[in-house]
Amino acid sequence: MMCPLWRLLIFLGLLALPLAPHKQPWPGLAQAHRDNKSTLARIIAQGLIKHNAESRIQNIHFGDRLNASAQVAPGLVGWLISGRKHQQQQESSINITNIQLDCGGIQISFHKEWFSANISLEFDLELRPSFDNNIVKMCAHMSIVVEFWLEKDEFGRRDLVIGKCDAEPSSVHVAILTEAIPPKMNQFLYNLKENLQKVLPHMVESQVCPLIGEILGQLDVKLLKSLIEQEAAHEPTHHETSQPSACQAGESPS
């Protein structure tokens, strides 16, 4: 009785062997879907690099925009610039340096025929006050989110529509890195930090969002449709989470 049982087990084992290679394409398809997502992210990243997004951000000028902001306390920049009477002709400056555009971390989200791209960037700020010889170092972090989708026209053809592009409010952080701050500057720097958090997102959006619109406008609709079909077929459930950056973890002087 044992012999037929072993023969049956061996026979079933042999039947299972040809099935093994057929299981391989499924992980491959899942990987291809992830590759498609990263391909779309790479297209956006390469476009931002090609259009010198970092240089555009670095060339942002602050003085007029800070003073013109309705949220800025009256005379803030004027006080910053004048400081002392004998330095009235010397302007203070805020320069952007060390821009880190996280092209490798661009996240693409799908829902039916709707897409969302999340682009994280971080940079340093150097404040040179006219009333003080010390340079105050700060850093800023934010995530730009752009939405785009496929929409049918009156003839049933799909067109790419680009929606809102702005900084996610909860992602905007400005931190003061310099530790040796004179006590007389604490309140001023606190106000400046609050004002920068209000105006920086709009200033960065004005440089980055037009570039993203141009990049997305060149995408092939068939490619996007293919990505949507892949998403509908596999519906990945994992979500990547990023660790807080050094700037996000930074603290302002008390």
From Swiss-Prot:
<dbReference type="Pfam" id="PF01273">
    <property type="entry name" value="LBP_BPI_CETP"/>
</dbReference>
<dbReference type="GO" id="GO:0008289">
    <property type="term" value="F:lipid binding"/>
</dbReference>
<keyword id="KW-0964">Secreted</keyword>
<keyword id="KW-1015">Disulfide bond</keyword>
<keyword id="KW-0732">Signal</keyword>
<dbReference type="InterPro" id="IPR017943">
    <property type="entry name" value="Bactericidal_perm-incr_a/b_dom"/>
</dbReference>
<feature type="disulfide bond">
    <location>
        <begin position="165"/>
        <end position="209"/>
    </location>
</feature>
<feature type="glycosylation site" description="N-linked (GlcNAc...) asparagine">
    <location>
        <position position="36"/>
    </location>
</feature>
<protein>
    <recommendedName>
        <fullName>BPI fold-containing family A member 3</fullName>
    </recommendedName>
</protein>
<comment type="similarity">
    <text>Belongs to the BPI/LBP/Plunc superfamily. Plunc family.</text>
</comment>
<dbReference type="GO" id="GO:0005576">
    <property type="term" value="C:extracellular region"/>
</dbReference>
<keyword id="KW-0325">Glycoprotein</keyword>
<feature type="region of interest" description="Disordered">
    <location>
        <begin position="233"/>
        <end position="254"/>
    </location>
</feature>
<dbReference type="InterPro" id="IPR017942">
    <property type="entry name" value="Lipid-bd_serum_glycop_N"/>
</dbReference>
<dbReference type="InterPro" id="IPR032946">
    <property type="entry name" value="Bpifa3"/>
</dbReference>
<feature type="compositionally biased region" description="Polar residues">
    <location>
        <begin position="242"/>
        <end position="254"/>
    </location>
</feature>
<feature type="signal peptide">
    <location>
        <begin position="1"/>
        <end position="21"/>
    </location>
</feature>
